[in-house]
């Protein structure tokens, strides 16, 4: 399984567009891996996770033709993860010779309502609308998504909404995708223990950076990443071969990429960056 982290930043990106804090100024000066666009991940070139307004930039930077993608998973409706109006260019006079004529979007009932609301105001042209389907599924439900079996996990994030994390397997390799979320609930951890034989990769929310454990219910920080890694190994879900990645990084609680790597040095946790490729 090839995992490409197209965007590794939190909700405002890093540096944030309007921000003059020391961290953002340092990131502008450092460039490279310290520049983080909005969160998005691509699996094997055919399964996309989330669809922020930075999607076109991600396609350009990675050399990906999004017309080759048949399936899209949405974690939740916050704008840094789902900007459905960007789909208006998928077809008609805007896109030709699309390899995959139909894009199937999957997410919670909350995501479906948001999708319908946006396009009740921002109409899709007939040709574009014909090529976009939505398949709603419930928490803990598993469904076949192209070459994968995907299971939705309730995320600790966005009170009043229905956010998901995902277990994604191709039958040989399994990814635990834990963005955006606080430390998983015992119910979710129990489900993972009972249903995930082995996680080959775990991508973890690290939004809270150096903040103390439990600083915010809806995001994890670096210490919680370390705790979760040890928990998954102790519970038998992960082992020394599992790739752990801290992702969804913001300027409020984390410095430049090299400084974050220093924090995780010796822990076996990698720090995500835009364009990062994992082969598991």
What are these regions (language model features)?
Residues 56-60, 85-92, 115-120, 223-233:
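Short, well-ordered amphipathic alpha-helices
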Residues 71, 75-81, 157, 219, ...:
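Histidine-centered divalent metal-coordination motifs
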Residues 111-116, 252-257, 279:
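Short, charged/polar "capping" segments at the starts of alpha-helices
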Residues 98-163, 170-171, 270-272:
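Metallo-beta-lactamase
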Residues 63-64, 90-99, 121-127, 230-240:
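Alpha-helix termini
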Residues 182-276:
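Cap/insert and terminal regions of metallo-dependent hydrolase folds
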Residues 1-64, 134-194, 277-280:
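Core dinuclear metal-dependent hydrolase active-site scaffold
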Residues 46, 52-104, 200-202:
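Active-site metal-binding motif and surrounding structural segment of the metallo-beta-lactamase
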